[in-house]
């Protein structure tokens, strides 16, 4: 059973009670992420996520960690481009203690200067680790160039330069302006009683006031770009893509189906053609990167430098085949069944249900029933897939980044000419 209550100050409480579960996953969400940062602020939202675990007026950083470990729970957080979440997974009997701990972290952190300086080094190590992980780093590179000049282009972690300039004043200013009642909600799934949680949240979060202030957001423009980023690696990594759909676009169901058929599993076109038939990659997949008002449809592959041209040629050929002929009837049916099956399997976890509650609240402001999603998937036609493929992979609005030791290989925008 899903329930929602809005406190008098505007903080929202969402729960999904799962009586069969003994565990609960609970998150304190704030609708703030790297998208809402100005250039010099890049990385400040993620930095706050780190610092909130470094001590409150009541607890040291060690005591925060010990309190959840003592009951066998998990305490963590993550920052996205449009939201940040502080969450825990515990037994249902420990939920009251956990929400009190999360509230203490969220509302009473002290931002000690020595902890800020220490955590800065941790964040810088996180940036270095990401840059040393090419199959992650290439996605940041693609964003940076495809959406250049827009906040969505910037990495969530920030850069070495911006992180080194973040100080206590910046952190507190962002908290003051954006961690406000109208941007905060609590989501919980599993062994949770809605009325009990509302009472606890009224006591703990009822004092938050005000409305979060943000500069107006606009959708980014796509930039036709083909970039070879030199880095000494054993493999070459490719990321290419074009304009996609937003989280709320009516065509999102067609995008789900196309993505699944093209590169969303072992039976997908790209996996079968590039890996299984040719053995040219270990990893290849397509993906959707979607936000409030925009998105892109991307493809990633990692291969040996001498096989880059072949992998790219086969990938573009498969896209072109869908644009020209659509999906086979069996492919279309299989993609729909795969999507619906994956959706139902995901419902077995309190983590995924809590995240689903939260994302529906952020993007739709309401619960999206599984039946509604299933109907949307089932209603997708081949014509919709063809139109979407042609729109997403328009050669005039595409980008590609290659990462690796690719000396002497220079590709121009005409690389996409195979798409027509």
For every predicted segment, state its role.
Residues 1-11:
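Short, Gly/Pro- and small/polar-rich lid/capping loops
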Residues 6, 17, 61-213, 228-229, ...:
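Charge-rich, well-structured scaffold segments of protease-associated domains
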Residues 10, 17-68, 142, 179, ...:
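Active/ligand-binding-proximal structured segments within catalytic/core domains
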Residues 11, 193, 266-267, 407:
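A generic "binding-loop/recognition-motif" signal
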Residues 27-29, 213-269, 406:
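His/Glu-based metal-binding/catalytic segments typifying zinc-dependent metallopeptidases
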Residues 30, 38-41, 51-55, 110-114, ...:
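Glycine-rich loops and low-complexity Gly/Arg-rich segments
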Residues 39, 58, 195, 199, ...:
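Double-stranded RNA-binding/processing signature
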């Amino acid at each position: 059973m899903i329930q929602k209550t809005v406190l008098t100050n505007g903080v929202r409480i969402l729960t999904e009670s799962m009586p069969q579960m003994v565990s609960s996953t609970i998150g304190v969400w704030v609708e703030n992420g790297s998208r809402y940062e100005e250039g010099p602020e890049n990385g400040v939202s993620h930095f706050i996520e780190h610092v909130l675990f470094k001590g409150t007026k009541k607890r040291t950083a060690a005591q925060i960690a010990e309190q959840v470990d003592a009951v066998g729970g998990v305490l963590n957080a993550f920052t996205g481009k449009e939201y940040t979440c502080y969450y825990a997974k515990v037994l249902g009997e420990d939920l009251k203690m956990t929400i009190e701990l999360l509230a203490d972290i969220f509302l009473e952190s002290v931002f000690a200067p020595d902890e800020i300086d220490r955590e800065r080094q941790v964040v810088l190590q996180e940036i270095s680790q990401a840059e040393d992980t090419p199959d992650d780093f290439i996605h940041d590179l693609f964003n940076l160039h495809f959406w250049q000049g827009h906040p969505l282009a910037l990495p969530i972690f920030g850069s070495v330069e911006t992180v080194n300039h973040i100080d206590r004043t910046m952190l507190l200013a962002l908290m003051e302006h954006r961690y406000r009642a109208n941007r905060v909600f609590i989501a919980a799934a599993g062994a949770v009683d809605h009325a009990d949680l509302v009472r606890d949240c009224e006591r703990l979060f009822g004092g938050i006031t005000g409305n979060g202030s943000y500069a107006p957001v606009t959708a980014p423009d796509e930039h036709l770009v083909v970039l070879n980023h030199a880095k000494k690696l054993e493999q070459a990594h490719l990321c290419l893509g074009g304009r996609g759909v937003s989280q709320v676009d009516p065509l999102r169901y067609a995008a789900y189906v196309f993505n699944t058929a093209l590169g969303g599993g072992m039976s997908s076109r790209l996996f079968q053609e590039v890996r299984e038939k040719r053995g040219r990659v270990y990893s290849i997949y397509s993906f959707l990167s979607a936000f409030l008002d925009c998105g892109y449809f991307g493809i990633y592959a990692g291969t040996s430098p001498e096989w880059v041209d072949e992998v790219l040629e086969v990938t573009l050929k498969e896209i072109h085949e869908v644009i020209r002929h659509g999906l086979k009837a069996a492919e279309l049916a299989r993609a729909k069944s795969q999507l619906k099956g994956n959706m139902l399997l995901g419902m077995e976890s309190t983590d995924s249900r809590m995240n689903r509650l939260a994302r529906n609240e952020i993007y739709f402001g309401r619960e999206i029933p599984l039946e509604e999603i299933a109907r949307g998937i089932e209603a997708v036609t081949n014509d919709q897939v063809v139109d979407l493929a042609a729109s997403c992979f328009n050669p005039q609005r595409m980008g590609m980044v290659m990462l690796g030791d690719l000396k002497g290989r220079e590709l121009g925008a005409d690389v996409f000419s195979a798409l027509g």
